[in-house]
């Protein structure tokens, strides 16, 4: 069951009454619009599919139906707070989201003050959970991801890096700086150029000209899906032949459509999941069937049935809340769900799911993929210690 709320609907942000009847509400706090809308909706698809697989849960011997309450945080920090307040007022018992660390950070205090736990799927900036006992996440963090990509770049023979990031974007600046710091510490490696651009900027010629002049082996450009297609094309049109790498947000086929398949050949990224993982075969088969059986879902997934990592994370975030609810004793409150989440441990489709003292997932490995012939090709796993295991 899915219910949609809209930012702007009057809301004080006050918690609704305690759970009544046989329905529990889980909030979906994701961007449906704005620069992160495409990725956000892929994460939503994972949660929607999870709700189809497990539409109810038994708590204290009573079965409850799960209703998803969706809001659009618009990829905007101000709108995110309003969206979070609307979820609180709707009576959700827990929240999933968000794709985009900035909006997650912005809304974090709203959920904390209302004592409603949130489980992020792909919000990787450390600030999301830091100091907030009500925020959890099922993904790895940017310090880990930045180090992983620096290790991969070094393993690929790249010794000079140009780093380009978006001003004011917590994800982009955070991941860029973690990559730069890790890369500069590696033997024979140096960051030869650092550039920044503003939100909604579309002309990157000045930045790319300066980056090209520094003669890098690799450009590391953590950005939104929208920006990625533009900047890759402009870089290749300018004659930049260096490797191009980024983080998890770039696992979206729209990028290749917008930049041109030939321009994206060899672009590398880190991500959380590979659909060819045999341990997740049941999920992959079921999710593909869901996409192919629902025209709207297939369209939101870019009109293909490739399983995005963020969809798998959205699925795992939902299942983490279900596992927590199973272990609630006494009244079903946000505080009780939070306490149960802290000790959750189960096998998710993206790996084993458990949380450390900060609410962060215990993850030690990233999947490396490259864009090749218009598709994402899994090439191996990378750890922060430099260990790279090629795909079989």
Where are these regions (language model features)?
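Short, low-complexity disordered leader/linker segments with a strong preference
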Residues: 1-25, 56-60, 89, 384-392
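Beta-alpha junction/loop-to-helix N-cap segments that form part of ligand/metal-binding clefts
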Residues: 11-19, 38-45, 57-129, 138, ...
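Periplasmic-binding protein-like
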Residues: 28-30, 87-101, 119-121, 162-165, ...
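Extracellular/periplasmic bilobed ligand-binding domains
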Residues: 177-275
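Extracellular/periplasmic periplasmic-binding protein-like sensory domains
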Residues: 235-315, 370-371, 376, 384-386
């Amino acid at each position: 069951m899915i219910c949609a709320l809209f930012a702007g609907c009057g809301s004080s942000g006050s918690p609704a009454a305690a759970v009544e009847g046989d329905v529990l509400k889980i909030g979906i706090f994701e961007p449906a619009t704005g620069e992160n809308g495409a990725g956000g909706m892929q994460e939503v698809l994972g949660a929607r599919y999870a709700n189809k697989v497990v539409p109810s849960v038994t708590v204290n011997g009573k079965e409850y139906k799960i209703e998803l309450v969706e809001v659009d945080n618009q990829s905007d920090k101000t709108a995110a707070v309003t969206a979070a307040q609307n979820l609180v007022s709707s009576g959700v018992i827990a929240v999933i989201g968000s794709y985009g660390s900035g909006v997650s950070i912005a809304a974090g205090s709203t959920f904390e003050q209302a004592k409603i736990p949130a489980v992020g799927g792909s919000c990787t900036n450390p600030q999301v959970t830091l100091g907030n006992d009500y925020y959890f996440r099922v993904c790895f963090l940017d310090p880990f991801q930045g180090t992983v990509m620096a290790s991969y770049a070094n393993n690929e023979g790249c010794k000079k890096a140009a780093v380009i990031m978006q001003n004011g974007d917590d994800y982009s600046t955070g991941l860029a700086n973690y990559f730069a710091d890790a890369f500069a510490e590696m033997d024979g490696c140096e960051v030869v150029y650092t550039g920044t651009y503003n939100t909604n900027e579309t002309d990157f010629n000045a930045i790319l000209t300066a980056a090209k002049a520094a003669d890098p082996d690799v450009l590391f450009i953590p950005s939104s899906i929208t920006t990625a297609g533009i900047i890759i094309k402009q870089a290749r049109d300018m004659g930049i032949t260096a490797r191009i790498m980024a983080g998890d947000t770039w696992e979206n086929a729209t990028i290749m459509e917008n930049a041109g398949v030939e321009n994206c050949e060899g672009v590398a990224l880190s991500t959380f999941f590979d659909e060819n993982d045999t341990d997740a075969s049941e999920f992959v088969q079921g999710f593909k069937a869901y996409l192919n059986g629902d025209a709207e879902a297939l369209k939101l997934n870019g009109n293909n049935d490739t399983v995005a990592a963020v969809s798998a994370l959205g699925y795992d975030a939902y299942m983490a809340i279900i596992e927590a609810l199973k272990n609630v004793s006494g009244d079903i409150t946000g505080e009780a769900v939070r306490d149960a989440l802290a000790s959750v441990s189960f096998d998710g489709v993206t790996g084993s799911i458990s949380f450390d003292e900060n609410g962060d997932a215990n993850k030690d490995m990233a999947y490396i993929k490259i864009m090749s012939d218009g598709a994402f090709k899994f090439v191996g796993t990378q750890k922060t210690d430099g260990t790279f295991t090629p795909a079989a």
